[in-house]
Amino acid sequence: MFLTEDLITFNLRNFLLFQLWESSFSPGAGGFCTTLPPSFLRVDDRATSSTTDSSRAPSSPRPPGSTSHCGISTRCTERCLCVLPLRTSQVPDVMAPQHDQEKFHDLAYSCLGKSFSMSNQDLYGYSTSSLALGLAWLSWETKKKNVLHLVGLDSL
C-alpha cells in the first residue's frame, strides 16, 4: 500500500526522468539550454552570504526565453542534473554571468532516480523547453528554507 508521500516522490522522479529523456532526443540539442529562475524567488530573498561575492553589482534580468549556458558552470561536459540544496540566502543568482556561477558547481551533484520527499504545497515547477528542466521548491514547513534547483544540461 502506497503512502501519499511515496506516490508524490514516485511521480516526481518519473517526471524528472521523462523530461531528461525527452531533452536527450530533441532535434535542437546543442551546447546551450534555456534556463529561467523560479519566478517566486523575489530579488530580496537572494541576499548575499559568505558563499557569494557581495561586491558584485546585481545583474539585470534577461528576458524570458533567452538562451545561455546552464548557469551553474561553463565547464560541464555531459548531460546531467545539477542539484543545489541551499539556504534561501545562498541561492545563486541564475541571471548573473557564468563566471559568477561556477563557485556553486561543486556544492552538490545529483543523479537520476534520486528520491525527493515533498508535498504538493512545497512544489513549484516550470519547464521552458524540451532542452531544459527547472524545478524548485520552498519548504515552508521548516524554519530553514531549502531551495532545490535542477537544470538539464546539454553536451558542449
Swiss-Prot record:
Q: Which GO terms describe its biological process?
A: positive regulation of transcription by RNA polymerase II
Q: Does this entry carry the keyword Nucleus?
A: yes
Tissue specificity here reads: Expressed throughout the brain in the thalamus, subthalamic nucleus, corpus callosum, hippocampus, substantia nigra, caudate nucleus, and amygdala.
Tagged with keyword Nucleus: yes
Highest taxon listed in the record's lineage: Eukaryota
Swiss-Prot/TrEMBL keywords = Nucleus
Q: Where is the composition biased (Low complexity)?
A: 48-59
Locate the region Disordered: 46-71
Which GO cellular component does the record give, naming just one? Answer: nucleus
| Disulphide-bridged cysteine pairs | none
- The main location class comes to nucleus
State the function annotated in the UniProt record: May play a role in FOS signaling pathways involved in development and remodeling of neurons. Promotes transcription of the FOS promoter.
Q: Please report the name of this protein according to its UniProt entry.
A: Protein CROC-4
**Species this chain originates from:** Homo sapiens (Human)
